[in-house]
Amino acid sequence: MAYWQREVLRSGTSMTFNQTYELDLPKSGWLASLVLYMRSTDTGAGFLTAVKWRLIDYISKIEVIGDGSEIIKSYDGRQALASFFYDTGREPVSMWRHYSNTPHRQWVPILFGRYCFDEQFGLDLSRFNQVTLKITNIATATEF
């Protein structure tokens, strides 16, 4: 049985509206999965007329890129949730409501193996000089 190190790479980091957030991942090690936890509070009337009312609907792209150009994983927010569901048969934890001034929360697991703590399959970070996580959102101050 392998020893799994659980590490929080960033906590309490804010994303700017309609921007891409980038995070450089460790240079070595074995990565079986990433779990992104996102939360926000909507504005008073932002979601009352919105077609997109879940937090995940405002994530237009989640990418894991190796050496600046090799795409390892690339999803929009809904595809990331669907991929986890197809792999595990479970829906990721979320909390969203369709009324004003409500906190929205979303867990987005990204698997590099067959499941979260897969000991056989995953991403060997030492194969790349640099691995970057990029999260692009399309939210505006009107909604959040």
Residue ranges and their predicted role:
Residues 1-144:
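Short, low-complexity Pro/Thr/Gly
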